[in-house]
């Protein structure tokens, strides 16, 4: 009888132990699930690796699922011009780990400086005569596995390089500045700049890159605006589309559910709302630009991306990110917020703050499993720090989240 009781107690003890381990395992899995709804990692930090500042983020996911995060690496100053390189980090595990940063784009011949710049910047340190600005990287992912990276040099010449191994190696640069020349009929530009952010490939196979241009001398009535260039032969030849948003700047682009294309743009209008236009083919026949009442515009670059959703609904999700403020002072850029539309941008009923505090430029990408990546400029309040004011550019951070996180109330 004693032996039977011992065995019974032993079985009870094992049962309790198993039950406890099971409960612990379920709690652990639940905690992992909650934690993984939103994660964030710092990819670049100011005053590291010999560079003063990292700005102007862009992010894409390749056909094989590799994440490419790229930016401007500003060597000596925080300014938009000077010695600036394009740096890239790669992730082959959906953003959990990242390769070291490498310089890409324009590693060969150095080009002369652009003598034209805004009047307000002439008194600032924009670099010496031997420095070179490589600016505004814009990647486009091709379904055939190629990644096309467009960028500008000195805000006046445009080049493209290609990678067929998910950003490990790149071809030599090919200049495509001639594709921008037809726009001189409307804006006699002295400055061109792709994106920033990313471009897109349409269902038709067309590659589309948005850009902005400026004429500082006012030689024609229209002095600045947003247009697109495109390629219908896998990036071998680039040509001009049409002016999409007069008086717009720093555009982003996405394909809508019906195959049409939306471009939205930064602007200086006192309504402080994002401007948008739509084209049936991503290049021509742009609609008259409108202001999107739900999307605040403080004079800042923003990100946009099309999301397939559950694949069942007729309309895709359209996601947008930008600062949640209308204060146009650079030190006031803050509270980067994600907006979501289920009707191709007609309404934006869903919004959620991604970062509380100083934050600015941002870009969006979608992983193969539907999770969303936001690569953005993140800062600190620093009210009593070195600058004595909020600073939105200390880090470049990549946040990963899913639609479930986005739909939960703050």
Model-derived regions, located:
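Asp-box/BNR beta-propeller blade signature and adjacent active/binding-site loops
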Residues: 35-410
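N-terminal secretory signal peptides that target proteins for export/translocation
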Residues: 1-9
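Bacterial N-terminal signal peptides
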Residues: 9-30
């Amino acid at each position: 009888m004693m032996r039977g009781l011992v065995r019974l107690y032993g079985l009870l003890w094992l049962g309790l132990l198993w039950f406890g381990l099971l409960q612990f395992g379920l709690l652990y899995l639940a905690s992992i699930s909650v934690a993984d709804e939103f994660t964030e990692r710092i990819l670049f930090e100011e005053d590291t690796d010999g560079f003063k500042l990292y700005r102007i983020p862009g992010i894409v996911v390749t056909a094989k699922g590799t994440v490419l995060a790229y930016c401007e690496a500003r060597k000596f100053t925080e300014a938009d011009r000077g010695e600036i390189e394009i740096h890239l980090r790669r992730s082959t595990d959906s953003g959990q780990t990242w390769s070291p940063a490498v310089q890409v784009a324009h590693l060969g011949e150095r080009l002369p400086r652009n003598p034209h710049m805004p009047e307000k910047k002439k008194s600032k340190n924009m670099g010496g005569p031997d420095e070179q600005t490589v600016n505004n990287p814009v990647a486009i992912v091709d379904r055939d596995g190629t990644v096309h990276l467009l960028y500008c040099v000195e805000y006046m010449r445009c080049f493209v390089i290609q990678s067929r191994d998910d950003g490990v190696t790149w071809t030599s640069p090919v200049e495509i500045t001639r594709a921008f020349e037809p726009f001189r009929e409307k804006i006699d530009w002295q400055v061109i700049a792709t994106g920033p952010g990313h471009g897109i490939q349409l269902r038709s196979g067309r590659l589309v890159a948005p850009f902005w241009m400026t004429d500082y001398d006012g030689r024609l009535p229209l002095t600045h605006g947003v247009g697109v260039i495109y390629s219908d032969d896998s990036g071998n030849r680039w040509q001009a589309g049409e002016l999409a948003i007069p008086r717009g700047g720093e555009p982003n682009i996405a394909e809508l559910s019906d195959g049409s294309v939306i471009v939205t743009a930064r602007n200086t209008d006192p309504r402080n709302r994002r401007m948008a236009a739509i084209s049936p083919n991503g290049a021509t026949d742009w609609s008259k630009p409108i202001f999107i009442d739900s999307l605040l515009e403080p004079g800042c670059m923003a990100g946009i991306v099309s999301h397939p959703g559950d694949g069942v609904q007729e309309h895709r999700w359209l996601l947008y990110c930008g600062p949640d403020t209308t204060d146009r002072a650079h030190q006031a850029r803050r509270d980067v917020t994600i907006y979501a539309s289920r009707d191709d941008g007609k309404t934006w009923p869903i919004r959620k703050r991604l970062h509380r505090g100083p934050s600015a430029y941002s870009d969006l990408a979608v992983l193969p499993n539907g999770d969303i990546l936001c690569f953005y400029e993140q800062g600190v309040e620093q009210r009593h720090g070195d600058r004595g004011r909020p600073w939105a550019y200390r880090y470049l951070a990549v946040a990963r989240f899913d639609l479930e996180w986005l739909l939960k109330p703050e």
